[in-house]
């Protein structure tokens, strides 16, 4: 099966959402390098904008790149369903949000600090450096130096 021609790659490096992306790779693959964008959301953005996900990201025009970045930051404008967002029912506003880049990192950091301040179980597990989501700790999640076995005399 022959590949479809998508025109020349005009840009070697594309800058979207504070991340430098390789212009010679497909949109679908490169969007996942942006913090806060998973493969499902990348697929939804490509479908909402009507762009083929296997098209090289360097072949997009400046207008298309602006639309792509706007769709990452404001997905509700493009009809992307809210169940794909990475921050549903925000505690401060109560709205469904989608955060990308440093906004995502900072917000997650504040959420963990808030959990620790209110002394919730999740906050306690974070504070103690233990697994938060119910994993077992008998054999894994041990930190520090190992103490060897001492032979009986």
Swiss-Prot record:
Residues 132-153 are annotated as: Disordered. GO terms for cellular component: cytosol; small ribosomal subunit. Pfam families: Ribosomal_S13. Located at the top of the head of the 30S subunit, it contacts several helices of the 16S rRNA. In the 70S ribosome it contacts the 23S rRNA (bridge B1a) and protein L5 of the 50S subunit (bridge B1b), connecting the 2 subunits; these bridges are implicated in subunit movement. HAMAP family: Ribosomal_uS13 (MF_01315). NCBIfam families: PRK04053.1, uS13_arch. Part of the 30S ribosomal subunit. Forms a loose heterodimer with protein S19. Forms two bridges to the 50S subunit in the 70S ribosome. This is Small ribosomal subunit protein uS13. It comes from Nanoarchaeum equitans (strain Kin4-M).
């Amino acid at each position: 099966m022959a590949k479809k021609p998508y025109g020349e790659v005009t840009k070697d490096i594309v800058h979207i959402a504070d991340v430098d992306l390789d212009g010679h790779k497909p949109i679908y693959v490169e969007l996942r390098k942006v913090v806060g964008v998973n493969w499902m959301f990348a697929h939804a953005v490509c479908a909402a904008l009507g762009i083929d996900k296997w098209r090289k990201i360097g072949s997009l025009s400046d207008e298309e790149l602006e639309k792509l970045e706007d769709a990452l930051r404001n997905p509700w404008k493009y009809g992307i369903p809210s169940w794909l967002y990475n921050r549903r029912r925000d505690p401060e506003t109560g709205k469904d949000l989608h955060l990308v880049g440093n906004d995502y990192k900072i917000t997650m950091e504040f959420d963990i600090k808030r959990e620790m301040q209110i002394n919730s179980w999740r906050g306690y597990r974070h504070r103690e450096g233990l697994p938060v989501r119910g994993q077992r700790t008998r054999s894994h999640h041990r930190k520090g130096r190992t103490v060897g076995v001492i032979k009986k005399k």
